[in-house]
Swiss-Prot record:
Entry keywords, A to Z: Signal
Similarity field: Belongs to the UPF0482 family.
Protein's UniProt name: UPF0482 protein ECA2253
Lineage: Bacteria, Pseudomonadati, Pseudomonadota, Gammaproteobacteria, Enterobacterales
Highest taxon, organism lineage: Bacteria
Statement: the UniProt record of this protein carries the keyword Signal: yes
Keyword Signal attributed: yes
Species of the source: Pectobacterium atrosepticum (strain SCRI 1043 / ATCC BAA-672) (Erwinia carotovora subsp. atroseptica)
Pfam families: DUF1283
Signal peptide start and end residues: 1-31
Length: 116
C-alpha cells in the first residue's frame, strides 16, 4: 500500500509542478513587451535631414560642374595635341617636326608653325 501511495503522489506532483513552473515563467514572458511604432517617414527630423542633404547637393553642384569642365578641357587639349602630332608626323612636308614643349608642328628651317 505504501508503494501505491508513492506512485499516486508522483502522479499528483508532476502536473502540479508543471503548473507552478508555468506560473513562474508567465511574469517573465509578460515583462518582455515589444513596441512597434509605425512612422510614415514624414517627421520633422526626416524632412530637415532631406532639406540639408538637398542643400549640400546643390552647393556642391557648381563645384562638381567646374571639376567636370576642367577634366573635359584637359582631355580635349590632350586629344588635340595627339591628333596634331600624328598629322605632323604623317605630313609630306619633310621640314615639319613636332615640338613637344609647345605642342606645335614647326618648320625646321624657319621655326614657324606649319599646317600639316
Amino acid at each position: 500500500m505504501n508503494h501505491y501511495s508513492f506512485s499516486s503522489l508522483i502522479r499528483a506532483l508532476i502536473p502540479l509542478s508543471l503548473v507552478i513552473v508555468s506560473a513562474v515563467w508567465q511574469p517573465a514572458a509578460l515583462a518582455d513587451t515589444r513596441h512597434i511604432i509605425v512612422d510614415s517617414g514624414d517627421s520633422a527630423l526626416s524632412k530637415e535631414a532631406a532639406r540639408q542633404s538637398k542643400e549640400q547637393w546643390d552647393s556642391t553642384r557648381s563645384l562638381r560642374n567646374k571639376v567636370n569642365n576642367r577634366v573635359e578641357k584637359e582631355f580635349d587639349k590632350t586629344e588635340k595635341s595627339i591628333d596634331g602630332r600624328e598629322k605632323c608626323n604623317a605630313s609630306y612636308n619633310v621640314n615639319a617636326y613636332w615640338e613637344n614643349t609647345t605642342d606645335r608642328c614647326l618648320d625646321r628651317r624657319t621655326g614657324r608653325p606649319v599646317a600639316p
